[in-house]
A protein has these predicted regions:
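Phosphate-handling substructures
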Residues: 62-121
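Generic beta-sheet signal
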Residues: 3-4, 45, 131-140
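Active-site-proximal alpha-helix that buttresses catalytic centers in soluble enzyme cores
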Residues: 3-66
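Short active-site segment of divalent metal-dependent hydrolases/proteases
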Residues: 11, 141-142
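Conserved histidine-centered catalytic loops in small-molecule metabolism enzymes
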Residues: 42-73, 96-98, 150, 171-179
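Short hydrophobic/aromatic-enriched beta-strand-loop microsegments
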Residues: 26, 66-73, 153-162
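Short beta-strand scaffold positions
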Residues: 49-50, 120, 136-137
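Domain-level recognition of soluble alpha/beta enzyme cores
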Residues: 152-178
Length: 179
């Protein structure tokens, strides 16, 4: 059996290159159209989302009106005061500079959470997923899971982040990109 990790479709924040973790955005029209072009040849027996609009809408666009459960532990990292802002908006902010030039896995954005904190909650939830589950979630969440499951690959967490609407099938100690 397998577990399927699928990143939500594009949102306005993705298109505008904004930090978006805790903001509950819908898919953009372009994101919905792109999902309509994807063809998944997978057969999950269970579906889980983070409960954010963008993940629930992605599930429906890809798999129709299937029953699913919500686990909020699979939500994206909380970017705190950097939420819904771009690099250009933040580049002169000393707190932002400290976050991006230091260890941004351990550093915490003001009113947000660190990558380490997010990874802990995500991996705790991931350990409970049964085989056959399709998890529709977020790029940072998928990247954290993949980095933890495949450390021998030597990739930084961000190198695992799939494109919107894409993801990975995990089967035992192997993986493949999907769709």
């Amino acid at each position: 059996m397998s577990i399927y990790l699928i990143r939500h479709g594009k949102t306005r924040a993705n298109e505008d290159h904004l930090y978006c973790g805790s903001t509950d955005l819908p898919l953009s029209p372009a994101g919905l159209a792109e999902l309509g072009e994807l063809r998944y040849d997978i057969h999950p027996t269970r579906f889980v989302t983070s409960g954010m609009r963008r993940t629930d809408e992605t599930l429906k666009a890809l798999f129709g009106n299937v029953p699913f459960t919500v686990d909020a532990r699979f939500r994206e990292v909380n970017f705190g005061s950097f939420e819904m802002k771009s690099y250009d908006m933040l580049k002169d902010d000393p707190a932002y500079q400290a976050w991006i030039t230091g260890d941004n896995e351990a550093n915490i954005p003001p009113q947000g959470e660190s990558g380490v904190q997010m990874t802990r909650r995500v991996l705790a939830a991931f350990s409970e997923l049964p085989d056959g589950t399709a998890l529709i979630c977020h790029g940072g969440v998928i990247a954290a899971i993949m980095a933890a499951c495949f450390p021998a690959e030597g990739k930084h967490r961000y190198q695992w982040q799939p494109l919107n609407g894409h993801g990975y099938e995990l089967s035992g100690d192997t993986y493949r990109p999907i769709p």
